[in-house]
Amino acid sequence: MWNMLIVAMCLALLGCLQAQELQGHVSIILLGATGDLAKKYLWQGLFQLYLDEAGRGHSFSFHGAALTAPKQGQELMAKALESLSCPKDMAPSHCAEHKDQFLQLSQYRQLKTAEDYQALNKDIEAQLQHAGLREAGRIFYFSVPPFAYEDIARNINSSCRPGPGAWLRVVLEKPFGHDHFSAQQLATELGTFFQEEEMYRVDHYLGKQAVAQILPFRDQNRKALDGLWNRHHVERVEIIMKETVDAEGRTSFYEEYGVIRDVLQNHLTEVLTLVAMELPHNVSSAEAVLRHKLQVFQALRGLQRGSAVVGQYQSYSEQVRRELQKPDSFHSLTPTFAAVLVHIDNLRWEGVPFILMSGKALDERVGYARILFKNQACCVQSEKHWAAAQSQCLPRQLVFHIGHGDLGSPAVLVSRNLFRPSLPSSWKEMEGPPGLRLFGSPLSDYYAYSPVRERDAHSVLLSHIFHGRKNFFITTENLLASWNFWTPLLESLAHKAPRLYPGGAENGRLLDFEFSSGRLFFSQQQPEQLVPGPGPAPMPSDFQVLRAKYRESPLVSAWSEELISKLANDIEATAVRAVRRFGQFHLALSGGSSPVALFQQLATAHYGFPWAHTHLWLVDERCVPLSDPESNFQGLQAHLLQHVRIPYYNIHPMPVHLQQRLCAEEDQGAQIYAREISALVANSSFDLVLLGMGADGHTASLFPQSPTGLDGEQLVVLTTSPSQPHRRMSLSLPLINRAKKVAVLVMGRMKREITTLVSRVGHEPKKWPISGVLPHSGQLVWYMDYDAFLG
């Protein structure tokens, strides 16, 4: 086999010399050469690379590697190579000749131990010496699970690096971690063996021809798009990948990752950055593209649990039980469908909804990025007189059609009433079947273009790897920015039960969703059960708002949405009474995730709220800059303040950032806030204070055994949290208890245990700070959803 490879390399060298000056030899090592990805895409991609490059000055050798013993591995690899095919326009005789050459240049070898890698390196060097070839570089393609990366990387680094003057390129396939922490860990491990410029992380969506065309299209059509590509003209952006197949046969992978990690965090996020980034002057510059992508990540508004809806096809749990030998009682919470609402808080995109959606067992297989423009025209003539190329009353949209669907191919679609686009010569105008409608319009209403020659994504990316084009791959910085954005949402959804759907056409309208004020929700209500059991599930309306007592104070309990609505109504009623009586309303609000839905409800459904006469105060604040995503004020700004007309001088953030320092005792930030309260709030008695309750019984930022804030004369104190950021500023318990009304909002199954515990304890604020909340002359009301109250 070794002698045959030498002969084949010499023949290839002769062909290169006849073609043009020899540029060196490239060894390509495919790890996982007998796996599914290699069989379906990678060997064909390598063959296409050979067809494209063999006559242009380089010689090649291909090493298929796996853990399998040599004889069996060679048989498996030979079987995978049987399906290689040539482009349709290549003559059969030429195809057979090139295929034969490729097979001769390809050999299998077992790579299992450090000695195996050392032997590979010696063989490559010996082959180069015998053939008299100069080494240009080596490509190691990791088509293996991530847990194998570290050992392989160590062996390559220690014994398989090419000599001086030759390059090394290491290709990595997703998944690149499970969350931000694991991605950081994996990146650190790989960084000990390889330089950043040596690593090529593959997201095969970046090899899709329609996706790869987004930046060039924007660049070629700058003049037409400059005035349109912004919040004033774009109504929304949809980035979609739908599949008809389910996860059968892949549930071990899917149980660990789910649809958000599998598709949204990588493929759809990459498309989002290409659509939303500021256009670099040079769209071919990897450094410029990365810099502009990172600017998008920095502007992304943080995701909350309400930013997403999730579903799961009905047979998924049964498939998991069967394939992973789970007990009959096992029910998976892994989503197979997800839609997420993303907002970008910058001048170009502020207020424009970006919808990312993907799912399995849906009604069609299709992928696209659709930019829908606002229709701001009013046409006088009747609809029958509207012309597609002229009427501004017809839909105006730009679609990067990634593939499949009714169109069946990659395409770029531009509404004729938008502009006539410019595309490179590698794209041609296309004609679809008569009567075909796409996105609400007949195909004839679009300028439609498709690639002159369709290419598989992996073939495209292998060519980019060979030529060292880094702008088509995921850098470490890009990867970690993406995980930093998605990890909080994944954590918030970890215990959320997905909506079940039958799959395919039977889904009907079950997965249809709507969005409003930063929240996404299903259009149709689904029955929920208070306690799982046989028989029909009761509807939320079957359970009225429950009124009872909790710790001798009034309790309001309901399903979460109804509870939030009730609390918002109560706050508005309290505000109206206070303004009518005193001319103003002083409201102190807590941060965290629980009040987000309340803020959104107040911002979108309470048009009679007396915001002009309302003063907003903070119950507590983390010692971070107010612009920090961890800041309670930043959450209040994102979900409430920017949506209501409240005078800026009525907004009172806590002064945690003074003298360019955070919560320094000598800056007296707590005393400053206390004096402000005393000056503006009569008797330092807030009209309403909204609190939450932590799993440890803390409230505000008053934690168990806190040395300050639980008693004494101080109105505002600095405290220390057991979780980061540790330093906090908080209203004290004595100040809270001066309020006319205190509302405690408790939501979620995670609070069930502490809710039960606190119901049984007495007045023990040192141990359970929440137990010390009891207004001296005001009212305390508990608001608990059924998950927290009943479990």
UniProtKB/Swiss-Prot annotation:
Q: Which residues carry this modification: Pyrrolidone carboxylic acid?
A: Q20
**Per the record, what are the reactions this protein catalyses?**
D-glucose 6-phosphate + NADP(+) = 6-phospho-D-glucono-1,5-lactone + NADPH + H(+); D-glucose 6-phosphate + NAD(+) = 6-phospho-D-glucono-1,5-lactone + NADH + H(+); 6-phospho-D-glucono-1,5-lactone + H2O = 6-phospho-D-gluconate + H(+); 2-deoxy-D-glucose 6-phosphate + NAD(+) = 2-deoxy-6-phospho-D-glucono-1,5-lactone + NADH + H(+)
What do the Gene Ontology cellular component annotations say? Answer: endoplasmic reticulum; endoplasmic reticulum lumen; sarcoplasmic reticulum
Which PROSITE patterns does its entry note? G6P_DEHYDROGENASE
Q: Which residues bind D-glucose 6-phosphate?
A: K174, H204, Y205, L206, G207, K208, E243, D262, K360, R365
- Record: residues binding NADP(+) 1: G32, A33, T34, G35, D36, L37, A38, K39, Y149, K174
* Tissues showing expression: Present in most tissues examined, strongest in liver.
Pfam families on file: G6PD_C, G6PD_N, Glucosamine_iso
Q: What is its EC number?
A: 1.1.1.47, 1.1.1.363, 3.1.1.31
Name the pathway it acts in: Carbohydrate degradation; pentose phosphate pathway; D-ribulose 5-phosphate from D-glucose 6-phosphate (oxidative stage): step 1/3; Carbohydrate degradation; pentose phosphate pathway; D-ribulose 5-phosphate from D-glucose 6-phosphate (oxidative stage): step 2/3; Carbohydrate degradation; pentose phosphate pathway; D-ribulose 5-phosphate from D-glucose 6-phosphate (oxidative stage)
> Where is the stretch described as Linker?
527-540
Biological process annotations from GO: glucose metabolic process; pentose-phosphate shunt, oxidative branch; regulation of cortisol biosynthetic process; response to alcohol; response to nutrient levels
Among Gene3D superfamilies, the record links this protein to: 3.40.50.1360, Dihydrodipicolinate Reductase, domain 2, NAD(P)-binding Rossmann-like Domain
Provide the residue span(s) of the region labelled Hexose-6-phosphate dehydrogenase.
20-526
What's this protein's family per the entry?
Answer: In the N-terminal section; belongs to the glucose-6-phosphate dehydrogenase family.
- Disease cited in the entry: Cortisone reductase deficiency 1: An autosomal recessive error of cortisone metabolism characterized by a failure to regenerate cortisol from cortisone, resulting in increased cortisol clearance, activation of the hypothalamic-pituitary axis and ACTH-mediated adrenal androgen excess. Clinical features include hyperandrogenism resulting in hirsutism, oligo-amenorrhea, and infertility in females and premature pseudopuberty in males.
Its quaternary organisation is: Homodimer.
Q: What does this protein do?
A: Bifunctional enzyme localized in the lumen of the endoplasmic reticulum that catalyzes the first two steps of the oxidative branch of the pentose phosphate pathway/shunt, an alternative to glycolysis and a major source of reducing power and metabolic intermediates for biosynthetic processes. Has a hexose-6-phosphate dehydrogenase activity, with broad substrate specificity compared to glucose-6-phosphate 1-dehydrogenase/G6PD, and catalyzes the first step of the pentose phosphate pathway.
Would you tell me the protein name for this molecule?
A: GDH/6PGL endoplasmic bifunctional protein
- What's the source species for this entry? Homo sapiens (Human)
Q: What is the lineage of its organism?
A: Eukaryota, Metazoa, Chordata, Craniata, Vertebrata
